[in-house]
Amino acid sequence: SGMLSFQFNFRRNDFPKRETSRITPCRLNEVSSLATIAGQAFVYDRFHQDYKLTAKHCDSLHEKWVTNCCVNGLADVVLVSRQDGDPSGFIACRLAGELNKVRFGEIVLVSVASNLHGQGIGGSLIQAALEWFQERTDIVFVRTESTNYSSVKMYLNAGFSLIESSNYFRR
């Protein structure tokens, strides 16, 4: 399997405007709903590709990952999209420091409820994240599995550039 790394450079790119009014920071009472979304949505990730890990264990890792983003400071903000008041997806964003007066950010984790894929929610989450990052960073990074074609397409459509491809191997 492999990973693809993308970057969005605010000094070079404009980003497409989408409707993001239904996307706001995570509320503590939504963490369990986000964990459920994360536990069910990932199938292309490196954990599920590892034959030594059970699907249940992999799902649990994602549930803990988003929980750590929301309550343990792994992310600086977790933005949540909602449909009919209920969480439909999330994006976790982290400020990653500065080097030579260039400020960096990272999209840590993105997930949309599996029954809502293909409705543009992911693209709206990316838009909301870019709006959040715009005043705080110069460059935003994100990584995804090379086999996660819908995410690759989503990042490219949002103006991200592919900057690196890497493979990883397991014994």
What are these model-predicted stretches?
Residues 1-30, 166-171:
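Acyl-donor-binding surface of acyltransferase catalytic domains
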Residues 4, 101-114:
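Conserved acetyl-CoA binding element of GNAT-fold acetyltransferases
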Residues 22-45:
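A short beta-loop-alpha structural element at the N-terminal edge
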Residues 55-78:
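Active-site rim helix/loop that mediates acceptor-substrate recognition in acyltransferases
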Residues 74-95:
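Conserved beta-hairpin
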Residues 109-112, 118-131, 152-157:
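Conserved acetyl-CoA-binding loop-helix of GNAT-fold acetyltransferases
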Residues 114-117, 142-152, 168-171:
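Conserved beta-strand-loop-alpha-helix junction that forms the acyl-donor binding cleft
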Residues 133-144:
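Conserved GNAT acetyl-CoA-binding A-motif
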